[in-house]
């Protein structure tokens, strides 16, 4: 169910078109949608079908959720891609011939899917990552000796993008296989920082199984194996592992362990000094603040004051990747619902959706909070009902 009027959708498409310096004719040509349809959609006279919306979004280099807030076709696109993704990695260790793209073209495509993952643009990942992963696996097996480390790093990044959709859409077996591929490629890269990134992502397996104690042990093992934080990238790798360890310790009810790891993460965030993306993981002082919220919420409703205090003192800047910001607002909404602040909780959920619609729609806590608000609170009932239909909480 769309929460936008036809006029709002049309204005959004027109604004994106102008930002890319396209005429309506140019957009029609690029999207393979008729000029009459583009013109009618932009003036709010016609509702675009899912196929038309996706074609326009692809031509404008955005995800369809950025054109229509209530768009739910991403789930269909992801589920259509998952069998192909599974098939691609079935024999990743077996050479299958050369890739269809050269090194430079692959490098650009890999950087693009990393950006999409950080921006929670799962529909775009689903469209591109099966074929890209196939090519990068082939590149790993055929690259010259001097390119082997680069090829392995590219495979780690691409498999991680595939894992993003598998994990977010609760295909945990496929997610675990992709993480195994990441670890295999990280070993081929023979780079401790790449291995640290793979260990960071591996924690998803433990989250999914609720195996918090062994997950914490695995992260602490990875921290001990990580290089000394003598450079910004090494400090970021170690700091990200400490952030992850703090959250899984919190999920396991280990408040002291969570605080210890959070302290280490904070120190390393201060050392890094500025927020950045390091081997596909966002780290810096702002990410540490977001994980302060994560830890407080992970520890449970008895720590709600701690969670609310984080939000009183700090809010995520727009410069942070969309998935990070969305996660913060979802966790804040959970704390606000615990604190009997339903209006604030709903505002936080809407902020999460504005930051990353696909991430919010697939987040179990966002659905849980929405369902609770709808059952027990009547404020803004019509708007909340629209939101609940969109997120699948009805």
Region locations from a protein language model:
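A detector for short, charged/polar N-terminal pre-domain segments
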Residues: 1-8
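Conserved binding/catalytic microenvironments
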Residues: 5, 98-394
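Short basic helix-loop element that most often maps to the first helix and adjoining turn
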Residues: 11-30
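Helix-turn-helix DNA-binding elements, focusing on the entry/boundary residues of the two helices
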Residues: 13, 24, 35, 50-53
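Recognition helix of helix-turn-helix/homeodomain-like DNA-binding domains
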Residues: 31-48, 69
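DNA major-groove recognition helix of helix-turn-helix/homeodomain DNA-binding modules
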Residues: 51-66
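Short, charged recognition helix plus adjacent turn
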Residues: 69-97
């Amino acid at each position: 169910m769309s929460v936008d009027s036809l006029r709002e959708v049309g204005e959004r498409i027109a604004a994106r078109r102008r930002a890319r310096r396209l005429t309506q004719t140019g957009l029609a040509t690029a999207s393979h949608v008729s000029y009459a349809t583009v013109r009618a959609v932009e003036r709010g006279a016609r509702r675009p079908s899912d196929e038309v919306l996706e074609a326009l979004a692809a031509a404008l280099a955005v995800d369809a959720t950025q054109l229509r807030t209530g768009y739910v076709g991403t789930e269909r696109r992801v589920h259509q891609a998952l069998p192909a993704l599974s098939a691609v990695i079935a024999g990743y260790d077996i050479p299958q011939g050369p890739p269809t793209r050269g090194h430079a073209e692959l490098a650009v495509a890999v950087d693009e899917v990393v950006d999409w993952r950080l921006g929670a643009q799962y529909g775009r990942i689903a469209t591109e990552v099966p074929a890209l992963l196939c090519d990068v696996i082939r590149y790993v097996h055929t690259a010259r000796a001097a390119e082997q480390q680069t090829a392995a790093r590219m495979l780690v990044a691409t498999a991680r993008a595939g894992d993003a959709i598998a994990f977010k859409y609760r295909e945990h077996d496929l997610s675990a296989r992709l993480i195994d591929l990441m670890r295999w490629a990280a070993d081929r890269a023979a780079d401790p920082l790449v291995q640290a990134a793979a260990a960071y992502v591996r924690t998803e397996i433990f989250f999914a199984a609720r195996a918090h104690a062994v997950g914490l042990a695995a992260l602490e093992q990875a921290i001990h194996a990580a290089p000394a934080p003598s450079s910004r990238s090494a400090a970021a790798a170690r700091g990200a592992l400490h952030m992850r360890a703090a959250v899984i310790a919190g999920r396991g009810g280990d408040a002291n362990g969570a605080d210890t790891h959070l302290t280490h993460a904070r120190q390393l965030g201060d050392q890094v000094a500025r927020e950045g993306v390091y081997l596909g993981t966002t780290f810096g002082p702002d990410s540490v603040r977001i994980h302060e919220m994560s830890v407080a919420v992970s520890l449970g409703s008895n720590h709600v004051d701690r969670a609310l205090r984080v939000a009183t003192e700090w809010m995520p800047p727009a410069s942070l990747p969309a998935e990070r910001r969305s996660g913060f607002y979802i966790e804040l909404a959970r704390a606000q619902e615990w604190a009997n602040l339903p209006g604030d909780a709903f505002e936080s959920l809407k902020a999460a959706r504005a930051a990353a619609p696909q991430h919010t729609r697939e987040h179990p806590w966002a659905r849980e909070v929405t369902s609770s608000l709808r059952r027990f609170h009547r404020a803004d009932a019509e708007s909340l009902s629209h939101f609940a239909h969109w997120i699948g909480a009805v």
